[in-house]
């Protein structure tokens, strides 16, 4: 068995097991998304000793004695700051990739609270987003850095719903902090699973 720390607690995992499988199936940590399964998209990003790392290609034998942190394990302060910044910047659309973006942002801000735009872009190079075009995500990271750097309180947002008022998405915080459910995150007692069975003979005539 391999022993390591997960969000501050001691855990152990079988040797040779993929970290993402353990985090999602055993720990119900759904911020770690299975987007590609081959280390390309960054939706499964976690912190390993403070470094952004893709959990879908990380085997348990590589994490002995290390500290693993997911979005669920971030401090309340960090959660509030990232939730505000990503929502305020309009950086959330479908939201699937955002927890991974938050982890990459956190890894950067552990190094510096005064990053340049180029440093933000470099930090997010391992994360793919098909919705936003990255500009608003980069803005969100810079905004989060500023709040943390200046030790400012997170502004409280009140929306009256009047015409012309700037309003945030009602589901933004849930998506940023991985509290919103996607289909693969759902678990129901007695759930039946299925998958598409592809024919080995695409031109075969079935009679």
Please annotate each region the language model reported.
Residues 1-155:
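Signature of N-terminal electron-transfer/Fe-S-associated modules in redox systems
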Residues 145-207:
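Flexible, low-hydrophobicity surface segments
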């Amino acid at each position: 068995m391999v022993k390591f720390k997960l969000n501050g607690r001691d855990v152990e995992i079988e040797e040779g097991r993929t970290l993402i499988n353990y985090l999602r199936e055993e720990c119900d940590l759904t911020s770690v998304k299975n987007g590609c399964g081959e280390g390309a998209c960054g939706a499964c990003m976690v912190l390993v000793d403070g470094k952004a790392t893709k959990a879908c290609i990380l085997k348990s034998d590589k994490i002995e004695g290390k500290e693993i942190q997911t979005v669920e394990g971030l401090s309340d302060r960090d959660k509030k700051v990232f939730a505000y910044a990503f929502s305020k910047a309009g950086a959330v659309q479908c939201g699937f990739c955002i927890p991974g973006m938050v982890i990459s942002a956190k890894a950067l801000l552990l190094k510096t609270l005064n990053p340049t735009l180029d440093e933000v872009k470099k930090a997010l190079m391992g994360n793919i987003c098909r919705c936003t075009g990255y500009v608003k995500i980069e803005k969100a990271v810079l905004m989060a850095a500023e709040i943390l750097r200046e030790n400012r309180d997170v502004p409280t947002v009140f929306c009256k719903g009047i015409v012309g008022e700037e309003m945030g998405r009602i589901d933004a915080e849930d998506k940023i902090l991985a509290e919103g459910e996607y289909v693969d995150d759902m678990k129901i007692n007695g759930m039946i699973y299925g998958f598409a069975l592809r024919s080995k003979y695409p031109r075969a005539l079935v009679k």
